[in-house]
């Protein structure tokens, strides 16, 4: 190969041309690659931030769920206590009502007994008066002593 040969100079020119083109293009390519690297890094940082935010949100949600479960248990316990108290109060009221009705019923029975006893006494007294009247009318002898009258009356009964 000779230095004056055109293919040699063509090759040298091509190498110089490629070098001259590559040099500014190298800066543009490197700048573009650097921008892509920065963009990827930003995306990775955003993804990590989103991941951390999601993890924090998940932990907060779990904490809220635990709080709600504790609140639910507390409310259930309070409701059971209130229900038990109401049941006891109503049971006591019913027992007092039944006791009151029992006392009223006993008083009513006693008053009915007294009324029946009085009616029987009145009937008995009326019957005795009737028997004594009949006896006096039938004997027409009013000269008897009280003991004789009682004896005769008892014999008739």
Swiss-Prot record:
Keywords: ATP synthesis, Cell inner membrane, Cell membrane, CF(0), Hydrogen ion transport, Ion transport, Membrane, Transmembrane, Transmembrane helix, Transport. It is found in: Cell inner membrane. It comes from Rickettsia bellii (strain RML369-C). This is ATP synthase subunit b. Belongs to the ATPase B chain family. GO terms for molecular function: proton-transporting ATP synthase activity, rotational mechanism. It is a single-pass membrane protein. Pfam families: ATP-synt_B. GO terms for cellular component: plasma membrane; proton-transporting ATP synthase complex.
